């Protein structure tokens, strides 16, 4: 039964809904792991003192990886 200001799903009323809840939990865990990995990579890249001068001025690479997904 749904309650006011409830943060989760209501109780499942069918086996299909039970499976959807399990799928949601599984997908949410995968999204959480990917987000954690991306956050770790961002923090590692920002906090490192090592820089490559060729990466800082690579506008061509940025143009390619911005336009390529739009073309695909």
UniProtKB/Swiss-Prot annotation:
GO MF term list: cytochrome-c oxidase activity
Chain ranges on the Mitochondrial matrix side, renumbered to this chain: 46-72
Subcellular location: Mitochondrion inner membrane
Cofactor mode of binding and number, as noted: Binds a dinuclear copper A center per subunit.
SUPFAM superfamilies according to UniProt: Cytochrome c oxidase subunit II-like, transmembrane region
A GO BP annotation: electron transport chain
Catalyzed reactions per annotation: 4 Fe(II)-[cytochrome c] + O2 + 8 H(+)(in) = 4 Fe(III)-[cytochrome c] + 2 H2O + 4 H(+)(out)
Membrane topology annotation: Multi-pass membrane protein
Mitochondrial intermembrane side: 1-14
Superkingdom to which the source organism belongs: Eukaryota
Function, in words: Component of the cytochrome c oxidase, the last enzyme in the mitochondrial electron transport chain which drives oxidative phosphorylation. The respiratory chain contains 3 multisubunit complexes succinate dehydrogenase (complex II, CII), ubiquinol-cytochrome c oxidoreductase (cytochrome b-c1 complex, complex III, CIII) and cytochrome c oxidase (complex IV, CIV), that cooperate to transfer electrons derived from NADH and succinate to molecular oxygen, creating an electrochemical gradient over the inner membrane that drives transmembrane transport and the ATP synthase.
Subunit structure: Component of the cytochrome c oxidase (complex IV, CIV), a multisubunit enzyme composed of 14 subunits. The complex is composed of a catalytic core of 3 subunits MT-CO1, MT-CO2 and MT-CO3, encoded in the mitochondrial DNA, and 11 supernumerary subunits COX4I, COX5A, COX5B, COX6A, COX6B, COX6C, COX7A, COX7B, COX7C, COX8 and NDUFA4, which are encoded in the nuclear genome.
Name of the protein: Cytochrome c oxidase subunit 2
Gene name of the record: mt-co2
């Amino acid at each position: 039964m749904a309650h006011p200001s409830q943060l989760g799903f209501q109780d499942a009323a069918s086996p299909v809904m039970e499976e959807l809840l399990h799928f949601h939990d599984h997908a949410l865990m995968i999204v959480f792991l990917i987000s954690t990995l991306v956050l770790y990579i961002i923090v590692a890249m920002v906090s490192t003192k090592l820089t490559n001068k060729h990466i800082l001025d690579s506008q061509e690479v940025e143009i390619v990886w911005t336009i390529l997904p739009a073309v695909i």
